[in-house]
Amino acid sequence: MVNVTGWGALREGGSTSAQLMRVSVPIVSKSECADAYKYMNKITDRMICAGYTSGGKDACQGDSGGPLTADGILYGLVSWGYGCAKPQYPGVYTNVANLRSWIRSHSGV
């Protein structure tokens, strides 16, 4: 399980939250995620997918750029998805580990 935190909308089309929210979601395999989005966007190694196949919990509008963490480790950043918490459509996150050399060369960190 990984954690997503943010002040984004609590439901699709809703208002942003006045307090920081957190949701725990499972990582989704690259093949399962690629299958879900096969008619929309290509899932690359620069992406991590997470969410429940049944939907109900996800990042939403206003959460973009927020952290995807587990045990104090940053694994990803909220990137995109099809709506918010829709069944069969996991959230898509930037894969920080895959972009580590780019981050280092552009930030010095």
Segments from the language model and where they lie:
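Extracellular trypsin-like serine protease catalytic domains
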Residues: 3-109
